[in-house]
Amino acid sequence: MKKNVHIVPHMHWDREWYFSTEESRILLVNNMEEIMDMLENNHNYPYYVMDGQTAILEDYLAVKPECKERIKKLVQEGRLIIGPWYTQTDEMVVGGESILRNLLYGIKDCDEFGEYMKIGYLPDSFGQSAQMPQILNGFDIKYSMFWRGCSERKGTNKTEFNWKSDDGSSVLVQILPLGYAIGKYLPMNEDELRTRMDKYLPVLDKGATTDHIILPNGHDQMPIQKNIFEVIYKLKECYPERKFFLSRYENIFKELEKNEDIDTIKGEFLDGKYMRVHRSIFSTRMDIKSANARIESKITNILEPLASIAYSLGFEYHYGLIELIWKEIMKNHAHDSIGCCCSDKVHHEIMNRFFLAEEKVDQLITFYKRRIVDAMSCEMALDKLVAFNLMPYDRNEIVSTQVITKMKAFEIFDKDNNKLDFEVVHKEVIDAGLIDRQIVHYGNYDSFMVYTINFKDKIPAMGYKAYMIKEVEHMLEKAYEVCDMVDNDFYTIQVNENGTLKIFDKKLNKTFENVLLMENGGDEGDEYDFSPLPNEKLIFNDNIVANSTIKKNRFNNEIKINYRLKVPKDIQARKNNRADSFID
């Protein structure tokens, strides 16, 4: 029986990498025209895979909106294969909700055109999350295809297997053992073609569980290969024992489903034996990583719960604005972008997207809070302070917040007129125009006071508690008091002379020494991988004298540690073990 080689035309589209999104868009417009022309004018050219992401279509249609119907027709014919993702997401750095939304909005985009590819197609993501089968099954997707992170050390030497999550969810996997580009620019020259195929075909055969293998015909930003039929004819001449034909990824899964004798694997895929998984990217460009984590948290833990509370009270749930925010950050969730293995100019663009997203998030959070507070009953007509608890359980915790008022002194009461015990930890004068331009627009130029206060109270689950602020003659403002250690129900913390901490855990009855010992060392790697300098003398803060202060009030403790460390100023100084600059 002849072995079947499925040649799958596709392109892998990095929206940005060492080039910007706008640079790639120029290529995209040309590539899309060639792809559609080929499909429309050659009905024996059956399929083309659009890299599993709809952001490509979004970028193209921003330039050529008049071509939407052309795309729609080809998608509905089953020839231009789109989705299911919005972008080619990373799985290890971004949050789980971001992965879900990437699929949700990608599928939503696909619905405007027709069917989407029901494969969790992530051919270049740097490792695979153990929860991916569970996520994919939630969208009725039962197939997965990827390249990076798998070897026989995971429990199988085959490139096809069932992948199971802890909850029992399962997907059928087709690994791309040599990546997504082994069929790029297939040559017409017989010697060149044989040289390449003689190297690749045995590897594909070895991992296969059926007589069907995949030869992906595409690469990064690669235009469609117009002479593919001539190349297929040449392949048939070179390898008469095989069948070569244009296909799509779903076709090989149909063949795999016929094979019941297939391994089952659990867990994540981060093995770099046969392909790089770039685990060092987890700590590159921490400004970008921290911005992403912060904004993801604001959306999922503040904005959307707050919007749900507002909706339950009769206000609009702004689906469109929230989708816009998610899509802004999901453009940054592509594996290269959030991996921060791009050029500096691209990293600037990534940070700008996060800036735009966070502006929308913060403003929408403020909008919802104001709508909820403004709608409160007239008996709450005094100045109000409202504490929200957006968790699904009651919380009795310390709240740190601000009161902005013209009052020189005030007291705080709940709706039952119980006086709230609070403490002012900081106050400052602020110009009225910095609060809201509408205040000074009406001639009110008097400054306001911003009081930072702490208090402890019980706030109901997925709800809020309102307080009234009443002006009084005077109030007690308790400042922090200086102390020599932190001591509470859980820990005793002391600051050592060099700025490290000695922590005694009362629950464990265990002492931890030299906490916050800092290590400074060099990295001679590239944008992907950390590479330590050979024979470098690492620098620690164990021999310095730090300036530290410990303060406390009734509600919290504060430790501040400052010191200066002498370190090399650049990689050459590090190679010479020469510390010639300072960091604070």
Task: Indicate where each model-derived feature is located.
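Catalytic and substrate-binding regions of extracellular carbohydrate-active enzymes
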Residues: Y319-E323, K331-D584
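Catalytic-domain carbohydrate-binding cleft regions of carbohydrate-active enzymes
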Residues: M1-K384, D416, L420, D457, ...
